[in-house]
């Protein structure tokens, strides 16, 4: 069992609320002891954690730098301006808004800026790798707007001619390029051509691969996109926040949609943490990190394919993989539960043309961002792939799962996670 040691800040929490302190402590141990493969998760640095938990949470800052409704903003304005400037430098954006609370509100703000209720949007279908906010009928994006979806072909690949035909048919006001479970690189130039042909704005949701873009290992949506949204966690290794980047001509509409359209004051501690993460993303070490993320994904994919796993699209070009387990006599939920018991954490996920229900789908989704942050490389991908194969083949054998969990913890002990270096046996 691991113990954690903290300074005065955690001691104060322990004294004030030992119940919450204990749960946080247990979560720290869990994050250390487990191999975390959830594609949308990562480990942030101690510097990002420090900014996130700073006294900036005490401040209220409605408005934008130089145009606030409350006084006492001199330092907050500097912090937000630094975050904006760093985002522009990292991504080459003309305008940046760093205030959205998370990815979904960021996407909603874009719709608020350019659409009226009932207008048409065209995005990737959720069961084929899209996101709830790209027009799913259970999301506000699918309730307030006429949401049309494009799908993948039988090989699990985007068919740009089919997307073009859909766009010509429905004439969307916004064409959305982005995903939450698509392991291939998007062709932004083709999306731009389609958008221009039908007179649509091109919105790119790069929440999953923003860090890869920053690191130069994934094509950039600039200058093709009119608007780009992203979360600041996932592959970017920042806090739980979001950004909207756009061409200068859309700056006023975007800013007005975020505030006062969607939300009140920004979370200043998050803004500071975004600035810190963007500084980290501008370094050579971050470029090496993102290259390793992609290399690890490819290496793990090779091992899993060799073990007979059916990877949707036959592999990966980014950080994530989607695996169809139909040939393994196990459902996605069963696999996710068994892997978790063995110390390997990921999520069950629908696959294209899935015949099973969303809460008990045929597939699993995994990504390599978090394990790469720990220092895992090719050798560990071989070990991990073999572990996953053993779990799937013995998913009902609790003794085997417990044995693998011990192996996982031993492996994790060799690779301390960022922000959790204080954990010791």
Swiss-Prot record:
GO biological process, one term: tetrahydrofolate interconversion
Pfam families: SHMT (PF00464)
Compartment annotation: Cytoplasm
Stretches assigned to coiled coil: none
InterPro entries in UniProt: PyrdxlP-dep_Trfase (IPR015424), PyrdxlP-dep_Trfase_major (IPR015421), PyrdxlP-dep_Trfase_small (IPR015422), Ser_HO-MeTrfase (IPR001085), Ser_HO-MeTrfase-like (IPR049943), Ser_HO-MeTrfase_PLP_BS (IPR019798), SHMT-like_dom (IPR039429)
Superkingdom of this protein's organism: Bacteria
Cofactor: pyridoxal 5'-phosphate
Task of the protein: Catalyzes the reversible interconversion of serine and glycine with tetrahydrofolate (THF) serving as the one-carbon carrier. This reaction serves as the major source of one-carbon groups required for the biosynthesis of purines, thymidylate, methionine, and other important biomolecules. Also exhibits THF-independent aldolase activity toward beta-hydroxyamino acids, producing glycine and aldehydes, via a retro-aldol mechanism.
Identification of the protein by name: Serine hydroxymethyltransferase
Native species: Desulfotalea psychrophila (strain LSv54 / DSM 12343)
Lineage, uppermost ranks: Bacteria, Pseudomonadati, Thermodesulfobacteriota, Desulfobulbia, Desulfobulbales
């Amino acid at each position: 069992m691991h113990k954690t040691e903290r300074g005065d800040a955690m001691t104060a929490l322990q004294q004030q609320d030992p119940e919450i302190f204990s749960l946080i402590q247990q979560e720290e141990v869990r994050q250390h002891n487990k191999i975390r493969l959830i594609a949308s998760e990562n480990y942030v640095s101690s510097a990002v954690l420090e900014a996130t938990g700073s006294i900036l949470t005490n401040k209220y800052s409605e408005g934008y730098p130089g145009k606030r409704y409350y006084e006492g903003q001199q330092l907050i304005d500097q912090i937000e301006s630094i975050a904006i400037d760093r985002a522009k430098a990292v991504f080459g954006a003309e305008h940046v808004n760093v205030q959205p609370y998370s990815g979904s509100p960021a996407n909603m703000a874009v719709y608020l800026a350019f659409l009226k209720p009932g207008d048409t949007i065209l995005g990737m279908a959720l069961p084929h790798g899209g996101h709830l906010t790209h027009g799913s009928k259970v999301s506000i994006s699918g309730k307030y707007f006429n949401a049309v979806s494009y799908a993948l072909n039988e090989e699990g690949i985007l068919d740009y001619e089919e997307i073009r035909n859909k766009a010509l048919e429905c004439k969307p006001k916004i064409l959305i390029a982005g995903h939450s479970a698509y392991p291939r690189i998007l062709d932004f130039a083709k999306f731009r051509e389609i958008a221009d042909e039908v007179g649509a704005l091109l919105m790119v949701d790069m929440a999953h691969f923003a860090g890869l873009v920053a690191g130069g290992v994934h094509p950039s949506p600039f200058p093709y996109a009119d608007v780009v949204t992203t979360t600041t966690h996932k592959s970017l290794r920042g806090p739980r926040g979001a950004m909207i980047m756009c061409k200068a001509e859309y700056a006023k509409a975007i800013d007005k949609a975020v505030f006062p359209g969607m939300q009140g004051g920004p979370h200043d501690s998050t803004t500071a943490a975004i600035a810190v993460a963007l500084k980290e993303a501008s370094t050579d070490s971050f470029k090496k990190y993102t290259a390793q993320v992609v290399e690890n994904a490819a290496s793990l994919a090779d091992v899993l394919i060799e073990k007979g796993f059916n990877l949707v699209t036959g592999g990966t070009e980014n950080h994530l993989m989607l695996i169809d387990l139909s040939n393994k006599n196990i459902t996605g939920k069963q696999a996710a539960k068994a892997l978790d018991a063995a110390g390997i954490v990921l999520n069950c996920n629908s696959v294209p043309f899935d015949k099973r229900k969303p809460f008990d789908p045929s597939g699993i989704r995994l990504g390599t961002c978090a394990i790469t942050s720990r220092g895992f490389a090719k050798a560990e991908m071989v070990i991990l792939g073999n572990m996953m194969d053993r779990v799937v083949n013995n998913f009902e054998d609790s003794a085997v799962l417990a044995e693998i969990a011990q192996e996982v913890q031993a492996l994790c002990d060799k690779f301390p996670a960022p922000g959790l270096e204080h954990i010791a046996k």
